[in-house]
Amino acid sequence: MSEVKKIVTFEATDDTPNPEELAWAFPDVKPGMAPLGGRVIVQLRRIKKKTGRIVLVEETKENEKWNNMIGKVVALGPLAYKNRDTMQSWPEGSWAQVGDFVRVPKWGGDRWEIRVPSDEENEDPVLFMTLNDHELIATVTGNPLSFKAYV
C-alpha cells in the first residue's frame, strides 16, 4: 500500500496586509546591484519605529532589523533555479519569482543598506540581502507584515 504524504503550510493569522503599510515596509528602492550566477537579491522588511503608541528604543529596532527574516525578492541572477552543469531549469521550477515574499535564513548572505531618497521623516535605510537561490527557506503565503522577528 502506498504511503500518503500530507503537505502542511504555515500561514500568518492576518492574511490581508494594509497596502500603505506594505508600501512603507517594502518601498520601491533599487538595490544598486544585480545578482550574479545563481544568486537572489531580497529586500528585507523595514522595521517600524513604534508599536501602538510605544516608541521603540534604538537597540530594539537594531535587534529586530538584523533578526528580521521576511523579505521580498527583487532580482534573480541569470543562473537562479538552473542546473549549473546543464543550464536547464530545475525540474520543480523556480521556488520564488521577483515580487514574491519569502523567508530567508537569519545568518548568512551578504547584506547592505540603501537610503530612501524621498523619505526624510524616516532616517532608517532599506536593507537588502544577496543569497544563493537554494538558501531561500519558504514562500510567505500569508501577510508578510504579521511575522515577528525573533532574537
Roles of regions detected by a PLM:
Residues S2-V151:
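Compact, glycine-rich, soluble single-domain proteins
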